[in-house]
């Protein structure tokens, strides 16, 4: 099994090499060795990155690792490598950046972005906030007068005069606009006559059963009959009184798509 697979892989690689040689032979001479016409990475026979003629000694130093950038930007302790390894032996564990750093030490910031709370900030720049030493020269804010003292006192609703006035105003409103009440002499609305069957006699006090039933509740329709069960299902599920199903005669299925016997 393994030998046959190996032979098939060898034959595939040989055919791919022959196909590549046939294509490169048809290309012009100045473009035959160009990286743009290298199709080994497309067909998977060569390296994934078909980069040719790379001088490793002329490459810039690799970018610094994040652990080396924390030491205040000083690159004295770490010795940068002058040449990067080959393409095949490149170490992918460290992060690679698009723009390599050319070993320029990062300059520390000249002044902090936000001053600390303990040290007073010096008023060197124009438009800055006054320092703690110059706070005595700032005039205090003007004192606002008491607004509540200028307002009149609120009306007292607990006195008897105001309560009687409001009660009288409510009484006047009620007397001026009385509510519409039903007068005693107005005739009462006549109820609609009840539906009575023609052959009923109320004089004798006997009420027919149909009228009583119609006044009590509407007549309900009887439920529809249950659909009959199919014959085969009923024959299979039929059982004796003892619970054991008895073998009953099941009719043969009807063959519908058959030709009639001529």
Curated annotation (Swiss-Prot):
Keyword Cytoplasm appears in the UniProt entry: yes
Biased composition (Polar residues): 10-24, 170-184
Keywords of this entry: Cytoplasm
Disulfide bonds: none
Record's keyword annotation contains Cell inner membrane: no
Biased composition (Low complexity): 92-105, 114-131, 157-169, 203-219, 235-248
Record region (Disordered): 1-262
Compartment(s) of residence: Cytoplasm
GO cellular component: cell division site; cell tip; cytoplasm
Superkingdom of this protein's organism: Eukaryota
Name the record gives this protein: Uncharacterized protein P8B7.26
Organism per entry: Schizosaccharomyces pombe (strain 972 / ATCC 24843)
């Amino acid at each position: 099994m393994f030998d046959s697979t190996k032979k098939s892989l060898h034959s595939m690689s040989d055919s791919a090499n022959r196909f590549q040689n046939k294509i490169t032979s048809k290309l012009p001479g100045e473009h035959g060795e160009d990286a743009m016409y290298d199709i080994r990475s497309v067909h998977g026979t060569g390296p994934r990155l078909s980069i040719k003629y790379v001088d490793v000694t002329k490459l810039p130093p690799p970018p610094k690792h994040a652990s080396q950038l924390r030491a205040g930007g000083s690159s004295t302790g770490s010795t940068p490598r002058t040449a990067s390894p080959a393409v095949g032996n490149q170490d992918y564990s460290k992060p690679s950046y698009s723009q390599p750093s050319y070993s320029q030490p990062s300059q520390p910031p000249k002044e902090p972005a936000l001053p600390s709370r303990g040290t007073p900030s010096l008023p060197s720049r124009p438009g800055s906030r006054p320092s703690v030493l110059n706070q005595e020269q700032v005039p205090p804010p003007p004192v606002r007068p008491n607004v509540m003292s200028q307002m009149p006192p609120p009306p007292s609703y607990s006195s008897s005069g105001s309560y009687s006035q409001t009660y009288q105003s409510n009484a006047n409103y009620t007397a001026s606009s009385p509510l519409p009440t039903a007068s005693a002499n107005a005739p009462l609305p006549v109820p609609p006559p009840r539906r009575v069957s023609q052959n009923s006699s109320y004089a004798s006090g006997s009420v027919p059963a149909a009228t009583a039933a119609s006044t009590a509740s509407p007549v309900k329709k009887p439920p529809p009959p249950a659909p009959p069960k199919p014959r085969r299902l009923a024959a299979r599920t039929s059982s004796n009184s003892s619970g054991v199903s008895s073998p009953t005669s099941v009719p043969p299925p009807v063959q519908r798509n058959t030709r009639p016997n001529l």
